[in-house]
Amino acid sequence: MEAEIAVVTGDVPMGIDEAGSAGLIRLVMLVNDVSLRNLIPSELAKGFGFFQSKPSSAFSPVAVTPDELGDAWKNSILHRVIEVDLNGTP
């Protein structure tokens, strides 16, 4: 289990730089980026990237606008600790 932050953007023009793209972030939400770690080494060794080792990710049912994060959202980065518990165990 990997806790990550996902963003939903408006239209992103090709070739835009980091500073220009920051203003296109519309929503922020949590995502569980699942990895089947025992499959990754053999898949990467084949040179084609992830196929079976990266199944579908799970997104939070709620998204917020960046301004709702207040001081925790600075320079398009969330400045908060994300903790993952599995069945109550960190």
For every predicted segment, state its role.
Residues 1-90:
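Glycine-enriched loop-and-adjacent helix/strand subsegments that border the catalytic/binding cleft
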